[in-house]
């Protein structure tokens, strides 16, 4: 038994959203009680007690779109790389990195990403992986890191024809085999999806193969209209817009997650809504790649299940929230834009996305939900109550303020110390791997 208490508790449970002095009791991987600290301690007097000391207690974060393979690109300088557009960024940086990754480097990239996620209070990660130099076994390598560190993750490999049809088919089989493996795993900590890069790198032949081989019970995770070229190519080669093409290939549906969706129109948004397909917004990436601003506020208004991701730019979901907030205010010239929509995406949207792949309820502190809890070092200087929670979180909190992270009832980090690995040793291994990757890329 574990109790975390003596903190300002944000539950994300509409029936009991805020407790001035709250506590959460966990038995194994399940929350068994949420209430006033004194009452919870009285109910479970023998439980291990973590004193939040007035700090904020809340559900752990969920990242709905991550790229583990990008971990070692931080600070990477590639000879001759001078991108003039998004396609140059893809080919000159990201596809170059993924073609050179070894299985060991992929695994260490996963350790680096998951450790940083833990330190930012993220315990559930939807990753979209690519390592076309070493495809087979790459998802299992990532899974090993996730299980070792105790985080929950949903994995896929981005299917693409960009490196030829042999590797394309291998990437299809990597997804198929991992999905079957994940479906047989009863831990509720691992899930799989059919990953796809984007419409413009996937032929009809490969679409048909995916349709034929995809196991039942899962959907797709694909970048959609991230850059304008994706749309132009689809119109030219297929005579239709991207979402229409995906719909025609039975890609859309409640288990499918579409990344970005920058260049989609009203008709496409209606298709996404009508098929109950999920969308994930990645604001920093869209801005950093100069791709544009998606009509995310319109999607939320239409009732499309929309979540928030980082696309590998950061592992701090609070940072992604802050950027999304100012991006849409700026883009729409509306000071009210994104105020309610973005926290809805981060908390309600990401939780619903995760709950389509994991059995236990995530993203909320309530009886029966998953024991995924964080403590944040935030002692507000202004009044805090259920009516102004989001204002405090957005303007007062960042990921580095997370002190304690619990996932599935296991304490992964306490008082900023990662407990589930020798962080210094892992980071030393990662630094060496990053150097070897950079040397290999630059010849």
Where are the language model's segments positioned?
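Active-site microenvironment of metallo-dependent hydrolases
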Residues: 1-22, 26-32, 37, 42-43, ...
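Divalent metal-coordination and catalytic microenvironments
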Residues: 7, 24, 29, 54, ...
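Alpha-helical scaffold segments that flank or form the walls of functional sites
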Residues: 57, 76-128, 133-151, 173-185, ...
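Active-site gating loops and adjacent loop-to-helix segments of metal-dependent hydrolytic enzymes
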Residues: 72-106, 162-164, 228-255, 275-278, ...
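Metal-coordinating catalytic core of metallo-dependent amide/deamination hydrolases
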Residues: 129-262
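Glycine-enriched alpha-helix->loop->beta-strand junction motifs that scaffold or abut catalytic
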Residues: 150, 214-219, 251-254, 271-280, ...
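His/Asp/Glu-enriched, well-ordered alpha-helical/loop segment
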Residues: 248-251, 255, 297-380, 394-398
């Amino acid at each position: 038994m574990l109790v975390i208490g003596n903190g300002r508790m944000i539950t994300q449970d509409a029936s009991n959203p805020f407790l001035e002095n709250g506590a959460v009791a966990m038995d194994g991987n399940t929350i068994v009680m949420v209430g006033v600290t004194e009452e919870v301690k009285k109910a479970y007097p023998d439980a291990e007690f973590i004193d939040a000391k007035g700090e904020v207690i809340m559900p752990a974060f969920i990242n709905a779109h991550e790229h583990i393979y990008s971990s070692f690109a931080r600070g990477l300088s590639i000879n001759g790389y001078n991108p003039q557009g998004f396609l140059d960024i893809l080919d000159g940086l990201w596809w170059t990195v993924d073609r050179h990754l070894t299985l060991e480097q992929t695994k260490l990239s996963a350790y680096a990403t998951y450790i940083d996620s833990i330190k930012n209070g993220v315990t559930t990660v939807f990753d979209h992986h690519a390592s076309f130099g070493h495809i087979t076994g790459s998802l299992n390598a990532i899974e090993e890191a996730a299980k070792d560190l105790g985080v929950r993750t949903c994995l896929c490999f981005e299917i693409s024809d960009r490196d030829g049809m042999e590797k394309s088919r291998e990437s299809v089989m990597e997804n198929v085999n991992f999905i079957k493996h994940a479906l047989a795993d009863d831990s509720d900590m691992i899930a799989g999806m059919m990953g796809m890069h984007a419409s413009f790198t996937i032929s009809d032949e490969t679409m048909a193969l995916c349709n034929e081989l995809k196991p039942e019970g899962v959907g797709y995770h694909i970048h959609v209209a991230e850059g304008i070229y994706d749309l132009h190519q689809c119109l030219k080669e297929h005579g239709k817009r991207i979402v229409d093409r995906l719909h025609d290939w039975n890609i859309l549906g409640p288990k499918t997650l579409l990344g970005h969706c920058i260049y989609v129109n009203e008709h496409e948004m209606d298709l996404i809504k009508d098929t109950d397909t999920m969308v994930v917004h990645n604001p920093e990436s869209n801005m950093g790649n100069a791709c544009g601003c998606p009509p995310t506020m319109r999607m939320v208004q239409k009732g499309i299940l929309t979540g928030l991701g980082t696309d590998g730019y950061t592992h701090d979901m609070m940072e992604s929230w802050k950027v999304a907030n100012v991006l849409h205010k700026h883009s729409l010239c509306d000071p009210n834009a994104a105020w309610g929509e973005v926290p809805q995406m981060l908390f309600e949207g990401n939780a619903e996305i995760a709950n389509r792949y994991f059995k236990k309820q995530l993203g909320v502190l309530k009886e029966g939900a998953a024991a995924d809890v964080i403590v944040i070092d935030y002692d507000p200087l202004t009044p805090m109550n259920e009516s102004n929670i989001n204002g405090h979180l957005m303007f007062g909190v960042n990921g580095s303020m997370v002190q304690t992270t619990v996932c599935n009832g296991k304490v992964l980090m306490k008082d900023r110390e990662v407990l589930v690995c020798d962080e210094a040793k892992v980071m030393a291994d990662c630094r060496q791997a990053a150097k070897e990757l950079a040397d290999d890329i630059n010849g």
